[in-house]
């Protein structure tokens, strides 16, 4: 539940879109209180793009809870790639960007987008491509904690990337999914 305009309202998690590598979740709020209902109808819509790698949208539970008081909330819920059957095909950066574009289009031109950490670059790319194609873009774009230009604040991860070849990464950090998983 969430409190809207001083009224406790019910919240139901719904799957708005199901794709092989991600579910778009909507948190639908319900109330019989006419004043709270009017307030909810006028509140902005936000899409929270959660990190894909090593995280799940459940880690942003508190963020969603706080947004529900004064926003219509959607969030990406990325599927662990090892759980996606091979026949669904690969999932690359361009697929990630395309998913984000599809979600923005579905929600509509009034959407506000928040990307948290890792998805800042794909979200920026998605919005930039929408704009360059003459499509609507989100009302706002908030990118939290993600490196847009990682050269500006290099970390040990950046140093590793700069000091190793592409083939080193292919040979040392890409692993086959164990046979007991569909991916």
Model-derived regions, located:
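Alpha/beta-hydrolase-fold enzymes
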Residues: 109, 122, 126-183
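Short glycine-enriched, charge-decorated loop/helix-capping segments at active-site entrances
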Residues: 87-91
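Short, surface-exposed "cap/lid" segments of acyl-processing enzymes
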Residues: 2-84
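Conserved acidic catalytic loop of the alpha/beta-hydrolase fold
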Residues: 83-85, 95-112, 124, 128
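An acidic- and aromatic-residue-enriched active-site/binding cleft used to recognize and process polar
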Residues: 52, 78-81, 116-121, 146-147
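Conserved catalytic-core motifs of eukaryotic protein kinase domains, centered on the activation segment
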Residues: 85-86, 154
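Catalytic nucleophile loop
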Residues: 47, 77, 111-126
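Beta-sheet entry/capping signal
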Residues: 45-46, 72-74, 110-113, 139-141
């Amino acid at each position: 539940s969430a409190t809207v305009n001083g009224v406790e309202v019910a919240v139901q998690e719904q799957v708005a879109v199901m794709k092989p590598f991600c579910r778009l979740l909507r948190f639908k709020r319900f109330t019989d209180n006419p004043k709270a209902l009017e307030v909810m109808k006028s509140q902005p819509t936000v899409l929270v793009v959660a990190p894909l790698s090593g995280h799940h949208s459940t880690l942003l539970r508190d963020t969603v809870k706080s947004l529900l008081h004064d926003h219509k909330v959607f969030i990406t819920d990325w599927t662990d790639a090892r759980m996606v059957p091979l026949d669904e095909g690969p999932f690359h950066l361009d697929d990630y960007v395309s998913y984000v574009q599809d979600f923005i289009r579905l929600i509509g031109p009034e959407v506000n987008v928040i990307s948290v950490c890792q998805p800042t670059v794909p979200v920026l790319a998605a919005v930039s491509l929408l704009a360059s194609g003459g499509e609507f873009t989100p009302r706002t774009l908030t990118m939290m904690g993600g490196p847009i230009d990682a050269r500006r604040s290099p970390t040990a991860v950046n140093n590793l990337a700069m000091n190793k070849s592409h083939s080193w990464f292919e040979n040392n950090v890409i692993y086959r999914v164990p046979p007991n998983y569909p991916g």
